[in-house]
Amino acid sequence: MVRIRPEIQQIKLRFGIVGNAEGLNRAIDIAMQVAPTDLSVLITGESGVGKETFPQIIHQFSRRKHGQYIAVNCGAIPEGTIDSELFGHEKGAFTGAISSRKGYFEEADGGTIFLDEVAELPMTTQARLLRVLESGEFIKVGSSTVQKTNIRIVA
């Protein structure tokens, strides 16, 4: 019988994770190892295996746990509005922008943002995302002012 560390058992109970497969236990262990770091994390795996739980584990066991946690399904946001959703926009940036709006990167400042289905983002948005990953900087739609954000990105 495989012996499971008590902290892994506690995480399974807390997050409703069922199963004792070695790969699952190893994935939880890795999530616990990266949680205290400030590294961005890419989670890979088959569709439907519960990858969305791991960003929550990483956030809850990080120094950012008191900050905002935002999960974004990138595949569910229309291409025409994705930049506004992620980066925010200024009043008058486009038809219907009657006021300025914070995007998820500004809202999650000090916390964690989980970008599910990140590969579904348009290439132009992926280029803007790269800037956030590299320097923590972004520009709202309709603005020329560079803003800083201090977030952990999990995708």
Segments the model singles out, each with a brief description of its role:
Residues 1-22, 29:
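Conserved ASCE P-loop NTPase core motifs with emphasis on AAA+ ATPases
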Residues 2, 6, 29, 57-60, ...:
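CheY-like receiver
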Residues 16, 29-95, 106-122:
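Conserved post-Walker A coupling segment in P-loop NTPases
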Residues 25, 56, 84, 127-131:
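Surface-exposed alpha-helical interface segments used for non-catalytic interactions
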Residues 31-34, 132, 136:
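AAA+ P-loop ATPase catalytic core
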Residues 70, 100-110, 114, 122-128, ...:
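AAA+/SF3 P-loop NTPase mechanochemical coupling elements
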Residues 92-99, 134-140:
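Short gly/ser/thr-rich secondary-structure transition/capping motifs
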